[in-house]
Amino acid sequence: PGVAGMARDEAPDSANSQFFLMRHPYPALDKRYTVWGRVVSGLDVVRALKFSPNPDGIVTDPDRMTRVRVPGDLPEGERPTVRVLSTSSAPFRALVEDTRAARGADFSACDIELPVEVN
């Protein structure tokens, strides 16, 4: 949950117009879309967006983003502080081993969800 990505075709640099925010796992998209981020704060907002139960995914009255700001565009005093577990740390290595043990033969790097703190 919280994956951010782009629709694309097989050509390089083809992800240019359709993005998505995943509310729940959806294995049919695995290896077909380009992931570029993860929602680390505000997943409740993502889950509140309207969605379509239909296979075509078309929402008849979709929510609209009327204003979007990324943290780098905010005045310095308004930017959130985001802390992520260092991938060179002992706790990260322990997380990898615990995840590997839990997933067994199904383990992949995508199974590791780094702990994040946003203030």
Feature-to-residue mapping (PLM):
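Cross-family detector of peptidyl-prolyl cis-trans isomerase
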Residues: P1-N119
